[in-house]
Each structure stands twice: as C-alpha cells, then as structure tokens.
C-alpha cells in the first residue's frame, strides 16, 4: 500500500467535499480521490434552494454566497397563468441562489482542502479490496496505486461505478429523471426569480402532449442564465423524448421574452436516480452519499442540498463500528417519509392526463402554489409545527406503509 488515510472519500463534488471538510475538522486524516481535475463542469440546473443555502452557510460559505445572486423564490408559468411564490418555510433562509457547478463545486472542494483534507485529483478509483469481515481495507486506482483506508465514503455521483463494485443496485420501477441544460447570455441575468415552466411540450408532433416535467431558466447573475428541460420516467413509462431538440425548442419559445441570441452553449444531459431508489448503500466501514445514494428530490431534481447534508451526516458517524444498518436507517429517518410521498406524487406526473387536469386548477390558486413550492423543495423539517408540515409528514408516514420497496432498501 503506497498511500493510506483514516478516511478515503471517492468523489470531490458537493457531497464528497462536504463530508471531507466535516471529517477533517473533526481531526480525521482525510484523502479525497476524484477522476476529474478541478474546476470541472457538471450537468445541473445550478439552482440552490434555501435548503442548499442553509447547508452552504453551515459549512462557512455564507459570506462567499452573499457575493452571488440571491433569488426570492419561484416564478411558475403554464396552463394560462403565472405566479411568483417567495420561498416559504420558517426553518430555512428566505432566499435561494444559483451558481454554475464549474464554480460551486471547486469552491466547496477548496473548503475541504482548507479544512485539512488531502486531494488526489485526475485519477479514478477502479477497485475495492475487503478483509474477511467484508470491511474495505484498500482501493486500487487506475494508475495501479493502492490506497489503504480505515473507512470509505463513496460520493462518485449518479452512476456510481464504485458503488456498483460494492453492491449498489438502482431500482428503476420508481421515478427517475432525465434532463439537459445549457447556458445563454441575456440582459435579464439578474432577475431575482427562478423561472419554471410547468406546461412543457415537445416540438413537432408532440406539441399536443404535456410532458411529465418542466422547463427552467435560472439567472446566474453573471450575464448568463442556466436554461434546461427535465422529465420524469420509470421503467414502465419511460420518457420518450430527445433532450437536445427539446432544449433547443424550449429556448426558441422563450427567446423573445428573455432576449436570447443563438443556441444554448455547453449543452449536456444527465440521468438522475431519485428518492433513495437504490439498495446497498452501506457496509461495515463504508457509506454511499449524495447522488450515489439517489439522494435527489423526485419533485424538482434538486440534489446539492441532500449531497451536502448526507456528507455532514456521514462524517458524524465515523466512530461507528458497523455502518451496515446504521447508515440506511439514518437515511430513512431523515429522508424516508419525504422521498416516499414525493416519489408517489412524481409517479402521478408520468400519467399523461394528470398534469393537464390538475395544472390549471393549481395555477389559479396562489395559496395552493405556495404549498406546492414548499413541499416540492422539501422546505419542511421535523420541528415545523404548522398544518402543512404536519400534513406532509403524515402523508409521508402513510406512503411508507404501502411502499413495496421503502427508500434505501
């Protein structure tokens, strides 16, 4: 073994870097391994909900985030209406933000580095090695280097090749997301609202069909917006759409309104396991976090907040002797109810008539849309005592009782 550390973190995105920062601050010897060299891009909407802002502030990035754009809430359009809803929920900051992942991820990674974590970038972990008790004792990198570890956190993203090596399985009978995004210059890049178009239709022959997803325009405050389209899918009802023609069509629909010139640049797409739809998230001395553990909100595709949260929670468990049951149980405690009911609601959106029937009713009620924004962004905590929070938690408990497969199992 050429290199070793108390804790090896595979993946230097928001989840891995947050875990590394918290673990290093607690006095652990931490090594972060990532196949990419930073800064690097990542397909994402770049939006930060108040939940994500809270986690950035907890990590010490509040002052840095104050130098970036702040958003008041969501502007939602579709079905003949438009409504602006300020970020609701008493337990989180009153503003969100949006920062390109090229910049955000490297900034969070530097927090981990400044906290004492070592970095091995531009090299991929390709294999894990166990002892007789199934504890991971070392990893092999693509260049043949052996890295020894006492504990391992896997944060290598939605496809999680190392997670598959450890036995992770993705269950596609619940909803997952497909999305594409790009960037466009506009004079409206400082607009203080994240814009979502809920009546998403495709080009050509599919114009008469509302797709199970939404289009978005997220101002970045730097002269550009992140523009994208996303749709929900299941193994039984796959989203039958070509993302690049769809994002180009969506851009053309919004061109005059936003003053866009030309096609989006840097278009890239992603596949998103959601709502804890994976099993095999832990072993005796290892844990999957963030996108690798399908910690993505099924109702809005948001994953940065859950990534940073699970990184912090994982770092708090490093003294645990056996994580095999402790980590899945903790994930279920924190996210099980919310993910279960969100998966169920998102599944309804994949039925062709659901959105055209309910969308016009919801858009006519600002109060209903305020509730929708709050639960869609999961701006509900166990400490919130209002009726919306109680109803959401109760619905989550009922939903879990009838789940064929509960989240993270």
Features from the language model and the residues they span:
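Conserved Rossmann-like nucleotide-cofactor binding loop
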Residues: 15, 38, 159
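Redox-cofactor binding/interface segments in oxidoreductases and associated redox assembly factors
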Residues: 10, 154-155, 288
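Predominantly flavin-linked oxidoreductase catalytic cores and closely associated redox partners
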Residues: 111-260
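Glycine-rich FAD pyrophosphate-binding loop
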Residues: 8, 24-44
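A conserved beta-strand/loop capping segment in the N-terminal third of enzymes
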Residues: 53, 57-107
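C-terminal helical "tail/cap" subdomain of flavin- and related membrane-associated enzymes
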Residues: 316-409
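Beta1/beta-strand and adjacent pyrophosphate-binding region of the FAD-binding site
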Residues: 1-15
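FAD/FMN-dependent oxidoreductases across multiple families
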Residues: 235-318, 325-326
